[in-house]
């Protein structure tokens, strides 16, 4: 069987043993790709590729709706969300739906509505995907030139980029509108242990918003992950939405500059590699956000961060021993350092013991007990509220540890049911997916650059050594 190569496409060609297999009317002879190469068979069939993308969107939205309803069906209002293995309901609660003071879930109906809306949307997308994959025109260029494209048409590609940017900007503004006008969102820092509130004075200062980007990603700086109030988060979304929309309009109205035309590879596989790189960055950032940030991901719904659980343990035992008569300000531990309290390198009063490494943690249940120089001894003696004790005791036993199958989880319950925090799930999954997307970016970028240079012609099977070897039998 001859090795296929199309100069028009500069794409590698796969030659299989079952090269005669025809799937959906497209075989290896006509497309240059075997059935398992998936959407590569549709590179030049814009109508069919549209069907594949719409159907894929339908699958994503179907998962969201079905999983949403599954979590609603299993939800127990009396238990914290993070104890129930939920990953979708915490996001809805963070947006302020169904939540009361202290992060208590008072109404699950909005969650049910969310699931149903996603299921209905997925049906529409699924129908559209099947229609375009099986019935609609194979190519859009002739019948619907606005939706048609050629991969090498740089102007059309940047127009499509612009449309995508406008849609992303609109998405960012949806959060801004929800926070400002439509009921507000959940603020873990609201006095008394968190509540839903409208954001009235969002941060628009470019110095503050873009200052996050100039911070070091390490240590106490923490880059954008260090954001610790909703005003900055919503202000950031306002800036992001504005930049995406104006950038989208710019890309629709302009043509790429000469240096851009020279610098980039202009092919379908190149665009795939750029997209994978962007998604990889998103995945790594999301991983850091959900692991470290207890403002964007409130601990009431996602469980405490690692440092938070550690500090909660120190606080819980300080409360207990103080009640039993211990002098928490002066008691020494086995190393001669303070058992309950000590000083940080810069002089603040911090919790003693192993949790000293997390001395710069900020958490809503702990901040009211600080003074101008770290933890305030008089507040620790007189001002500790019952809700702070309850919350820290709960967080102490729900540290985000353990493997994802919970074999190495923390045995926090009397019946030895191991606990795995949603923070562990979400951080690990986004890190792993971010890594795989990065590898996919390298793979497709390499292939796209090779194809553009003209030397990616597939494997020449005529001289493959195995063809000249004696059969095994």
Swiss-Prot record:
Residues 1-14 form a propeptide. Belongs to the PsbB/PsbC family. PsbC subfamily. NCBIfam families: psbC (TIGR01153). It comes from the Eukaryota. PSII is composed of 1 copy each of membrane proteins PsbA, PsbB, PsbC, PsbD, PsbE, PsbF, PsbH, PsbI, PsbJ, PsbK, PsbL, PsbM, PsbT, PsbX, PsbY, PsbZ, Psb30/Ycf12, at least 3 peripheral proteins of the oxygen-evolving complex and a large number of cofactors. It forms dimeric complexes. This is Photosystem II CP43 reaction center protein. It is found in: Plastid, Chloroplast thylakoid membrane. Keywords: Acetylation, Chlorophyll, Chloroplast, Chromophore, Manganese, Membrane, Metal-binding, Phosphoprotein, Photosynthesis, Photosystem II, Plastid, Thylakoid, Transmembrane, Transmembrane helix.
